[in-house]
């Protein structure tokens, strides 16, 4: 009896079946490896790109390390340091190729791209069996950590001007930055000739930096006292006029007060010794802006910027751009101002100086930057 035998499987078909699965698993494994390598490289690269900062040797940060001595406290101590820091920053930004960021009012500890750091601190040190308070100023090159300048000053009632002059001269040598003749002439015009008067002026200037109503009122009072006691100090007279016209922009003066202020401004802007100073054009810019004369204000503040690169000039430039409906340019101006002097003071000026500004609307980048703090 014949029985049916099943047909034998073709060797060629079996080989093709085996080859298919070999290649399938090989390609699958290869794809998984490629995906894992891609994910791992992406995961390691992203954090590195956020943390890497290249130093700029021409940028300088000014920081306040310690605001007072433990054994001695003076209402003028901090104002003097703030005034010196503001003067150094404005002088270098105006008369050199360095870009200085005055961070005395900025308390956020974050990485910086500045190649150099100028630190101001008040420290106690035992001197002749007694505790004495020193103002310590140190300039460090962040590229190699070396100290370029290390000075300590004992502040007395009459040596404030001498300390400031010595510091400027020492910075000139440390940075290999000769001061031009125009800077020397400017300092002669904007600073009093007596050290004790400088402390009072810096206290009034500190109130101006704050920018709020109470501070501006106090600044006006102090500057009025300085002008009354030292009428030859015409720069204090100009700064009082600036403070008063800003106060008027926020809370209008009565008719009699405004007439007196306008007369004072007319007299100040004609003083020959102040003609080449930025503050004259700040006064003109604010005065014109209050009256709605944006083109006149724009011309004035740009002349002021040519004479002095300062945070206040760029705040005022931003205000002029806003009034002209040029919000993109206003945002650039406000960011420049905050970059020159970051902190709550400059932010207050941006938001409330002359008129109120919506930072989220006009400068959304700055709003997000501050929110991330």
Sequence positions of predicted segments:
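N-terminal intrinsically disordered, acidic low-complexity segments at the extreme N-terminus
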Residues: 1-15
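A structural "domain/chain start" motif
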Residues: 23-24, 29-82, 197, 208, ...
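Catalytic-center loop of serine/cysteine hydrolases
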Residues: 46-48, 84-202
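Alpha-helical segment of the N-proximal tetratricopeptide repeat
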Residues: 196-225, 229
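Residue-level recognition of tetratricopeptide repeat
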Residues: 205, 242, 249, 286, ...
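Structural motif corresponding to the intra-repeat A-B loop/turn of tetratricopeptide repeats
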Residues: 210-213, 247, 291, 324, ...
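Boundary/linker segments of alpha-helical solenoid repeat arrays
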Residues: 234-235, 269-279, 309-316, 338-353, ...
């Amino acid at each position: 009896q014949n029985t049916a035998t099943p047909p034998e499987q073709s060797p060629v078909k079996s080989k093709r079946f085996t080859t298919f699965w070999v290649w399938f698993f090989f390609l699958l494994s290869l794809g998984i490896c490629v995906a894992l390598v891609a994910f791992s490289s992406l995961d390691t690269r992203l954090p590195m790109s956020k943390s890497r900062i290249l130093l700029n040797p021409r940028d300088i940060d000014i920081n306040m390390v310690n605001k007072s001595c433990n054994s001695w406290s003076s209402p003028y101590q901090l104002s003097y340091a703030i005034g010196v820091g503001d003067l150094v920053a404005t002088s270098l930004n105006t008369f050199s190729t360095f870009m200085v960021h005055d961070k005395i009012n900025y308390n956020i500890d974050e990485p910086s791209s500045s190649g150099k750091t100028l630190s101001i601190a008040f420290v106690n040190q035992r001197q002749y069996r007694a505790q004495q308070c020193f103002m310590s100023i140190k300039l460090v090159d962040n590229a190699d950590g070396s100290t370029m300048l290390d000075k300590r000053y004992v502040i007395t009632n009459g040596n404030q001007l001498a300390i400031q002059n010595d510091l400027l001269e020492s910075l000139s040598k440390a940075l290999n930055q000769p001061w031009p003749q125009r800077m020397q002439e400017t300092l002669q015009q904007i600073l009093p000739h007596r050290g004790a008067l400088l402390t009072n002026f810096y206290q009034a200037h500190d109130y101006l930096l704050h920018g709020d109503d109470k501070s501006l009122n106090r600044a006006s009072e102090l500057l009025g006292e300085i002008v009354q006691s030292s009428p030859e100090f015409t720069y204090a007279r100009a700064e009082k006029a600036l403070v008063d016209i800003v106060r008027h922009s926020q809370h209008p003066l009565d008719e009699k007060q405004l007439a007196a202020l306008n007369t004072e401004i007319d007299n100040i802007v004609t003083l020959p010794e102040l003609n080449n100073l930025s503050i004259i054009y700040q006064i003109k810019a604010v005065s014109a802006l209050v009256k709605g004369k944006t083109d006149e204000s724009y011309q004035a503040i740009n002349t002021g910027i040519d004479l002095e690169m300062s945070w206040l000039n760029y705040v005022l430039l931003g205000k002029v751009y806003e009034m002209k409906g040029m919000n993109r340019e206003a945002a650039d101006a406000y960011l420049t101002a905050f970059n020159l002097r970051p902190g709550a003071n400059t932010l207050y000026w941006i938001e409330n100086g002359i008129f109120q500004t919506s930072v989220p609307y006009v400068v959304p980048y700055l709003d997000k930057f501050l929110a991330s703090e």
